[in-house]
Amino acid sequence: MSLYSPPKVDVNVVPNPRIINIAGEARLPAIVGVGPTVRYVTDEAVQRGVTNIDTLSVFPASNVVITKVAKRSGLNYVSGSSSNDPDAFVGEFGSLYLPSGSVVNSQIIDGYISLGNGKISWGQDPISVSKGHVPSTGSVYYVSYRYDVTSEQFEPKVFSDKQSLINTYGEEGNTTGSLTTAASIVLENGSPAVIVCQVSGSLSNYSVSSYRDSIDKLRKKSAVEEVIAIFPSGSLPTSTFRDDVHSYLFQHVQLMNSVGRWRGMYYGVPSPKYNPNGFDLIGDATISNSYIGKATTYSDSDVILVAPSVVWRTNSKNERIELDGSYAACAVAGVHAAQTLRSTPITGFAVTGINIEEDKWDMFQMNTLGAGGVLVLQNVAGLITIRDAITTDSTSADTQEINVVSQRRLVQRTLSQKLFETYTNKGKTINPQTVRDVEATTRSILNSLRQSGEIFGYGTKDDPNTGETKITAIQDSNEPRRINVTCSVKFLYPMKFISVTVSTFV
């Protein structure tokens, strides 16, 4: 028996295989720097169990040191201090618990024993419970403690909110909390997220090699748009230390660009208020400890040096935190990452989260800095803006403009990824049709970038006067496993100059 179907019209839309989705993962700033090696927890709520062992949320951990156990949260207690709360004592009417073996009223009491790994042992004596020395079964008490971070602390992590930063790297500061400060500045300037990698070692014991190790870990991350190294405030590091780290970071950028994981390097210099070796000098190419001297050292289209070095910020307690040029670089990186289109120029855009001196330089000084390859932040009437979004390479518009360099990376990344996803390792062989398909796919990719506003256009003809070349694909005669594609693109350049000629008449 045949199936009955009433009169109808069937319509099926067949996807066009040559329409390429160019949407990719967000491009994020990445920060490397020193952070806490010990974490602190205040007033974690714990419910007394039926056995003599209770477990903290951090278990299993190393070197857990309990600093306070209380019946209520917020109890102010420091052993031997006269500024304790009135109920900071042990007993039925007190709010404090003490370790077993403590002496209260000339008697040794039962209490808690920290096992050092996140577990707490309590005495089971009912008399101790009735006296308030031990919490009763089912009751809630509050524990403050510190513990050593694990190796996971030193792996790259992605953050999109400030509280997660605080939970991982502590409250803002310019020493232990410097990663929280730097990453918060990136987020406050609009970046959807930020990648952070803590350098191994404490504030008093970190090295160039530990910075190198953290930078190397970013090799695994494909979403990095630029990398920034920050350093804690204080007598360390030395100028040589910073130079060694920046040199290695520059090598990292060059290496990753050579293997198809394109990214850039943002950096700043220390101020005299942040580091004894800091400086705030315009200088020239011959003076190494000057803005222009540092920009000359890394004159490259993938490098951005941000000035000034004297930067500060107010934390949640309304305290001034002295920062340096690295944090200014974080602010600019956040503005850059906030743009939906890589082609968007950020010259004139506002920067938030940091403070700089108002009217620090006059027009001529800022022009000198710009000519030397320095991106200058200016504060006019309290509004901090990017005076000119440039790299350290002033060779041409293609190398100097940040948005043009970003377009270049986008074209490289998109062509590489989409052609690889479509053709490589797909069991395809090279024949005349394959060559034509690769050419057509290249055209579709570039057209998608043009339609989305990421580039001005792509070449459709050969014009030796402009350098335009049409898209062509051909099998390599020397390496028959390769298809060679040639094409050209025209970038979207920022409008920076307008020339007006005025004539007079009578």
Q: Where are the model-predicted features located?
A:
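C-terminal edge-of-domain segments
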Residues: 472-506
